[in-house]
């Protein structure tokens, strides 16, 4: 008899537990529906942060379809995926700010160079060699030009540009600006002539010929002479010879 009573007691306990769980689940659904219907939790505001060149209204419109949606029903990853499709966005974080606001923080890909293709068109690329899109709001983007005689078919927005000459220019450029930050804005163009890397200095209009050997010493000599002695406008400055500067 005691065993039968114990079994019936366990059965009642499990039945009661199931009823309680079902009641909680039902109550949760009712509460969720109630919250979803409350206007206070409908998304009303979208805040955009971190953009420098990409137009704020453009970024706002990418998240605008979620206006009026209950904030509890929004998956932030769904919003983030809309932004990752843009070539200029390197990273994005979407946060909920209760009761009715979402905050979109973007990290832009910023152009380092314009690459000129064989047809003469310019394409911005970032520090990772990714080709960026062009739009009217990037009109103030002022970047050094890279002329490596590349075919238009090799360039696609959102894709990484692979070219050994371009890799060499990146290496040289970053070494140069470590020596003098002014060179970020002082260089107007990089190009190859007779398999030698050249660049044009904006201040003097001079063409400077470089070699990879002892690049730091070449750049230091050029900067010192330019700032203290100056060069005749549009001269050619050959830095390939150790300890010498040849002016043509």
Residue ranges of each PLM-predicted region?
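Extended, alpha-helix-rich binding/interface surfaces that flank or overlap catalytic cores
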Residues: 48
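Charged, solvent-exposed interaction patches on well-folded alpha/beta domains
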Residues: 1-45, 57-70, 77-81, 85, ...
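Extracytoplasmic beta-rich repeat domains
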Residues: 53-55
